[in-house]
Amino acid sequence: MSECRRMSNKYLLFLVVCLLWLTGCGTKEDKRPDRPGQGAITISVDESFKPVIDEMVQVFESNKPGTKIKVLYKPEAECFKDLEVDSIRMIIATRRYNEYEKQFIVDSFNISPESLVVARDAITVIVNPKAPDSLFTMDDLRAILQGRFKKNLIPVFDGVKATSTVRFIIDSVLRGDSLTSKAVAARSSEGVIDYVSKTPDAIGFIGVSWIGNSEDPGQLSFLKKVRVAGIESSYKGIGFVKAYQQNIYTKSYPLVRDLVYTLKENYKGLGFGFAAFMSGDIGQLIFRRAYLVPQVLKNFGIRSVEVEEQ
């Protein structure tokens, strides 16, 4: 009898331990603040991508009614500083994290970040409609950006320090040299368009998603205010090209860059769900419709543009 009682007690103890273990697992699961298709998160995004990311978030939230993605649009350098902020789940910029940034995330949050190029973007050059010149070689651009062009043109950016556009220009066009002190910093990409539209001797540099979609009413209104410049092609014998989707795809247009997300999650949360959406069929189609070039699913084809290039 005593032996049976001991066996019964051991059995009960075993059941209690199992119950506590299962309860603990369930509690851990329930403590997750979000899931791929449910919850709310905050992400930090390069301001030059605002039009296409606004559309991306709107479609995602429409497809997933239980989700809310708060987007903070900032200069790229500030987005990368946000990798150090616990509440920022994802950033979207034009480059991947570097080794220092990766190690900081691993050490601080015990998270191994994930990064993926989901689209290809370009920097569009715009001029005032009354400007006599709208075709520029790369040497012309370098001269303008350094203040030694034959005509006094004023470069205009969405900031002159921490933005992805300025970083690209300094790294890829000026090859490390400094911008002219005459460069003007607008408050945003829309501010660049507004400044150029009012200043005949201004030349602006903005992301193509602000002005590349001729089917978007807002961008059509921008196109009525400024003129898109043609830039000397990367390939000999082609002449001058504009930042159209076909030219971005082939890299015939020389000012091409990436759109990259960096995800900070140690479980499959809403950030994971949004990342999967951007790299999936619908997200890649949204990039294509915005006249960027999808980089994950490349079987959508490139949209033709019925515009004669000079």
Predicted features along the sequence, with ranges:
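N-terminal secretory signal peptides that target proteins for export/translocation
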Residues: 1-8
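Bacterial N-terminal signal peptides
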Residues: 13-23
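Pocket-flanking alpha-helical
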Residues: 77-108
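Exported/periplasmic ABC-transporter solute-binding proteins
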Residues: 25-64, 72, 84, 116-121, ...
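Periplasmic N-terminal soluble interaction domains immediately after the signal peptide in Gram-negative
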Residues: 109-114
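Hydrophobic H-region at the start of alpha-helical membrane spans
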Residues: 11-14, 251-253
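A short beta-strand-loop structural module common to alpha/beta enzyme folds
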Residues: 68-76
